[in-house]
């Protein structure tokens, strides 16, 4: 058993969970997978529907080349095998928001094969999640049940939108690992520009496969590849937040354990997560591939990719999160933690690098990942919309470096910057916050303090830790403007503290 595997205590012994995810990522494209209809969030019902999307008679699908390029780019970003020949199939099922009566997907010949995603846990350790495949498919429309008590309305704006379904192997063993995997996958997709990763809008959602087994059984499965060593899995559909992913997994694992410990049998089924109640509920029995009667779509030729075209896409890939993190650590001397915080968002990392030019990079990272990030998070905004340009953070750090202000005063200056009072240097001048570096002025404050506290001055020789009180009093006397390093140095000299 891996030391990171979570053991769940049951009445009849220990259990472990086994998790695999199918992540549906909406392709960042201006038009749909097989039609020229626009893709956008917030349009009125059925405003972005073509005759192809509505499955009108005689309308034929035409493959969107850009969506194929986005899928290839994603596959390369996942270190996956790009299949030069793939095929589109019809997945047959009936639902009101699927006007064709089938979904165009990819069954046994997907565009992308096996890959891998390296994921970091909260404690800094890493694990790999193997990618089984990535395939392109159409999204369905949306059924609206709350518009009329006697009817269901259908909005086909989403119908035909391109999705990438990214299927993982069952390599995750805790709910925290599953959430961390989705976070990392989202970061990669956003870096690549192939999906905007907005989970609130449904552009990234996960189907979570959960099963439980006894300790040691998972290792047997990994050694043999035989699923008989694992329990029956249930799929939780369309979970669209990291927190809900964790909650759904924890509840479902407990539910399955209770059934098994009561002597029952877990049914393979599709379930939904109810975030209000924090529980999963049955949706339908889980279908197998043969239930969908897959067959090649006769309206679409096999998809054959030119190796040179794939190579040209690979050459345009941006620097991805893992490579960027390693570079930030080596180039700027950042800690793994700070680099990890910065690379969560490419714009965040770019902001840091722009601010760090010619400055103390570690100090810049500290301001970006702490004060600025906290303010942006509280305001619910991102670095792209930061009211403080990177030049302001760079100037603030410069004022600290050249001794114009102390780190303590810098925090006060930062608050005024955030309030929109101007650039750092202007605020320092306007508010008279320049640090006192004049040793004469500092010595006078120290002499006055010692003269007024002779007993404490004598006692500090035996209790050097009491020096902090003197430092605090001098800083207070100078309005926090005295250079802390100079204060410390002069106090030690005058009080005879080594």
From Swiss-Prot:
Its EC number is 6.3.5.-. InterPro entries: Asn/Gln-tRNA_amidoTrfase_suB/E, Asn/Gln-tRNA_Trfase_suB/E_cat, Asn/Gln_amidotransferase, Asn/Gln_tRNA_amidoTrase-B-like, GatB, GatB_C_1, GatB_Yqey_C_2, Gln-tRNA_amidoTrfase_suB_CS. GO terms for molecular function: asparaginyl-tRNA synthase (glutamine-hydrolyzing) activity; ATP binding; glutaminyl-tRNA synthase (glutamine-hydrolyzing) activity. It comes from the Bacteria. GO terms for biological process: glutaminyl-tRNAGln biosynthesis via transamidation; translation. The keyword Protein biosynthesis applies. The keyword Ligase applies. Keywords: ATP-binding, Ligase, Nucleotide-binding, Protein biosynthesis. It holds the Pfam family GatB_N. It catalyses: L-glutamyl-tRNA(Gln) + L-glutamine + ATP + H2O = L-glutaminyl-tRNA(Gln) + L-glutamate + ADP + phosphate + H(+); L-aspartyl-tRNA(Asn) + L-glutamine + ATP + H2O = L-asparaginyl-tRNA(Asn) + L-glutamate + ADP + phosphate + 2 H(+). Belongs to the GatB/GatE family. GatB subfamily. HAMAP family: GatB. Allows the formation of correctly charged Asn-tRNA(Asn) or Gln-tRNA(Gln) through the transamidation of misacylated Asp-tRNA(Asn) or Glu-tRNA(Gln) in organisms which lack either or both of asparaginyl-tRNA or glutaminyl-tRNA synthetases. The reaction takes place in the presence of glutamine and ATP through an activated phospho-Asp-tRNA(Asn) or phospho-Glu-tRNA(Gln). Heterotrimer of A, B and C subunits. This is Aspartyl/glutamyl-tRNA(Asn/Gln) amidotransferase subunit B. It comes from Caulobacter vibrioides (strain ATCC 19089 / CIP 103742 / CB 15) (Caulobacter crescentus). The lineage of its organism: Bacteria, Pseudomonadati, Pseudomonadota, Alphaproteobacteria, Caulobacterales. The gene is gatB.
């Amino acid at each position: 058993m891996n030391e990171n595997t979570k053991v769940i205590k049951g009445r009849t012994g220990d259990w472990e969970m086994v998790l695999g995810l199918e992540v549906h990522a909406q392709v960042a494209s201006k038009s749909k997978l097989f039609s020229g209809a626009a893709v956008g969030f917030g349009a009125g019902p059925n405003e972005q529907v073509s005759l192809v999307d509505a499955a009108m008679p005689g309308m034929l699908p035409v493959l969107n080349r850009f969506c194929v390029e986005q899928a290839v780019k994603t596959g390369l970003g996942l270190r996956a095998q790009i299949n030069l020949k793939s095929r589109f199939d019809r997945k047959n099922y009936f639902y009101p928001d699927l006007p064709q009566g089938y979904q165009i997907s990819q069954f046994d010949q997907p565009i992308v094969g096996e890959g891998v995603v390296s994921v970091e846990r909260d404690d800094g350790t890493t694990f790999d999640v193997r990618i089984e495949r990535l395939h392109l498919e159409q999204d369905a429309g949306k059924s609206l049940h709350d518009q009329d008590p006697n009817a269901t309305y259908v909005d086909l704006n989403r119908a035909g939108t391109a999705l990438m379904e990214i299927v993982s192997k069952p390599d995750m063993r805790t709910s925290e690992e599953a959430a961390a995997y989705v976070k990392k996958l989202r970061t990669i997709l956003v870096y690549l520009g192939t999906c905007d990763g907005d989970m609130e809008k449904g552009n990234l959602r996960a189907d979570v496969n959960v099963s439980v087994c006894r300790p040691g059984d998972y290792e047997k499965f990994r050694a043999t590849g035989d699923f008989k060593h694992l329990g029956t899995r249930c799929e939780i559909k369309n979970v669209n937040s990291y927190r809900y992913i964790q909650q759904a997994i924890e509840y479902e694992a407990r539910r399955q354990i209770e059934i098994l410990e009561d002597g029952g049998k877990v049914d393979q089924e599709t379930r939904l997560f109810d975030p209000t109640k924090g529980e999963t509920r049955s949706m339908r029995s889980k279908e197998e591939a043969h239930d969908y009667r897959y067959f090649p779509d006769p309206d679409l030729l096999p998809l054959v990719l030119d190796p040179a075209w794939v190579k040209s896409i690979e050459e345009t890939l941006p620097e991805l999160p893992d490579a960027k993190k390693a570079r930030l650590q080596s180039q700027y001397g950042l800690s793994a933690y700070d680099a990890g915080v910065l690379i969560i968002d490419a714009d965040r990392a770019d902001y840091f690098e722009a601010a760090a030019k010619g400055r103390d990079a570690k100090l810049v990272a500290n301001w970006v990942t702490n004060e600025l990030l906290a303010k942006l998070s509280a305001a619910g905004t991102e670095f792209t919309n930061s009211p403080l340009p990177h030049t302001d953070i760079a100037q603030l750090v410069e004022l600290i470096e050249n001794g114009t202000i102390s780190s303590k005063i810098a925090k006060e200056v930062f608050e005024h910057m955030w309030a929109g009072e101007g650039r750092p240097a202007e605020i320092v001048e306007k508010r008279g916050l320049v640090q006192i570096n004049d040793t004469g002025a500092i010595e006078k404050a120290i002499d006055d303090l010692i003269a007024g506290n002779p007993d404490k001055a004598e006692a500090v020789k035996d209790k050097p830790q009491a020096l902090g009180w003197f430092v605090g009093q001098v800083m207070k006397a100078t309005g926090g403007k005295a250079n802390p390093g100079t204060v410390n140095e002069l106090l030690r000299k005058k009080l005879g503290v080594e």
